A protein has these predicted regions:
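Bacterial N-terminal signal peptides that target proteins for export
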Residues: 1-7
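Non-catalytic effector/regulatory segments
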Residues: 2, 198-199
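Intrinsically disordered, low-complexity repeat segments enriched in small/polar residues
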Residues: 6, 13, 24-25
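Hydrophobic h-region of N-terminal signal peptides that target proteins for export
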Residues: 11-18
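Short S/T/G/P-rich N-terminal loop/turn motif that feeds into the first structured element of a domain
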Residues: 22-198, 225-228, 260-261
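Alpha-helical oligomerization segments
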Residues: 201-261
Length: 261
């Protein structure tokens, strides 16, 4: 039974899929080929921009010029886990999430604003990895939908990067880290008990030209009264005695927000 449930806690792949940006290392030939393959199918994905700024009027101007699904947030807290969040990002800043089937870019006048006035996180969804058809069906059946904006809805954006060592592992070695074994509970088995009350979505930042130290963006939502559950989820995932995959993380910080619109 445990084998059946392994890999179910995967949003759009694995929570930790990505190659560190600006590492100064060359990708392997295998990864280059994967990148070429992905490029041909990106148009089928959902693109996202998380745009953060202390200037609410600027954010309003940005949303007026964008098409697609838009949500608005207010940053409540920032928690550095490994490494640090971008300089200037602070409590009280506004954030907009813009999703579209087409690739998203801000108009040039917004991209050239003074450094620190605006911070952009970019990503795109992919199909599920490391999951069988049966596992996907189970995940779809048990996972909850996004929450409505309200004072009771907390959203957390966690940019994450993995070490070069992870990407030097063979594919089967990486996948083994998601499996339940006699020694480890594993990433997906840990998360399975939370999927009914914590919404999650994964955006990849690899291969899309985003010059950033993170490899992908993990996005969560939950009701405020489930805050302790969410923290328990993170604590379990970060416990390398239960989830050895986390030992390959080299960048991780949490942006806690209120979903207001």
């Amino acid at each position: 039974m445990r084998t059946r449930y392994c890999c179910l806690f995967i949003i759009c792949a694995v929570m930790l899929l990505g190659e560190p940006k600006n590492s100064g290392q060359m990708r392997s030939n295998e990864d280059d080929e994967k990148g070429k393959s992905m490029t041909t199918t990106l148009s089928e994905r959902t693109w996202v921009l998380f745009v953060a700024s202390a200037d609410e009027r600027l954010l309003q101007q940005i949303t007026q010029q964008q098409h697609g699904r838009i949500n608005k947030y207010s940053i409540c807290d920032i928690n550095n886990v490994i490494g640090k969040a971008p300089a200037g990002l602070a409590q009280g800043w506004g954030v907009v999430r813009i999703e579209s089937d087409a690739r998203l870019e801000l108009p040039e006048e917004f991209q050239s604003t003074p450094k620190g006035r605006i911070i952009i996180f970019r990503g795109v969804t992919q199909n599920l990895h490391y999951t069988s058809d049966i596992q996907r069906q189970e995940l779809n059946k048990r996972s909850r939908a996004e929450f409505e904006p309200s004072n009771e809805t907390t959203a957390v954006l966690i940019p994450i990067g993995k070490s070069l060592t992870w990407w030097q592992l063979a594919q089967d070695q990486r996948e083994a880290h998601f499996q339940t074994s006699c020694k480890y509970k594993g990433h997906t088995t840990i998360g399975l008990s939370y999927v009914d009350r914590v919404f999650r979505k994964l955006y990849h930042s690899r291969y899309i030209g985003a010059s950033a130290p993170y490899d992908f963006l993990t996005y969560f939502e939950f009701n405020n009264h489930k805050r302790d559950d969410f923290k328990m989820l993170l604590n379990e995932l970060r416990d390398t005695s239960r989830n050895p995959e986390w030992s390959y993380i080299e960048l991780e910080y949490e942006i806690w927000m209120k979903k207001i619109e």
